[in-house]
Amino acid sequence: NDQLARAYRLAASICEDIGNSMLSEEINLLNQGIEQLPDGYYNALAGQLASAYIRQAEATGNPGYQKDALRTYQQLEKNGNTTLEVRLNIAMLQYQLHDFSKAMEMLQALKDDYPKDYRVYKWLAFVQGELDLQNGASYTKTLGYYETAAELYRAEQASGVYDPQMDELDRMARNNWQ
């Protein structure tokens, strides 16, 4: 079974390397692997599957793939994979699917668990910005999250990290949240 799981992952990776033209095949391979292998192998294939769903959503503009990715990440979390990356991806997808209250709930928990990770505050700023816009509220909380994200991000930049979403957040802070 280990070899079969590796074979599915490798075949899916080859599809990913070829590019967007093979996304459907990559998704089908990973789903087939999940169906064929015992439940214990779900987590070994699911992260790759969720990533493929996200790329397919970007390539097609179809939010159904984001929902598939969200369900996949939520199952990963339910299966005990509670890493920062899995939980951040859940919050990011909830944000993209306009479920701002659920995204905020996840991000508040992440803030407690990872108080020094700029990505948590980046997404808190995005989500709070949407909530403030909907509620006609001042952007005080949003700017607070943004400032914390920017400060923590500067430390990451010193070690060579670049995050284009932080550029987007900078633009939003300058243009929308004053």
Please report, for each region that a protein language model flagged, where it lies by residue.
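Short coil turns that delineate tetratricopeptide repeat
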Residues: N1-D2, P38-G40, N81, P115, ...
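Helix-start (N-cap) detector for alpha-helical repeat units in TPR-like alpha-solenoids
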Residues: A5, Y41-N43, A50, T83-E85, ...
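Residue-level recognition of tetratricopeptide repeat
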Residues: S13, S51, R55-E58, M92, ...
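Residue-level detector of the short coil/turn that links helix A to helix B
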Residues: G19-S21, A57, G64, H98, ...
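TPR/TPR-like (Sel1-like) alpha-helical repeat modules
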Residues: N31, G129, S138-A158
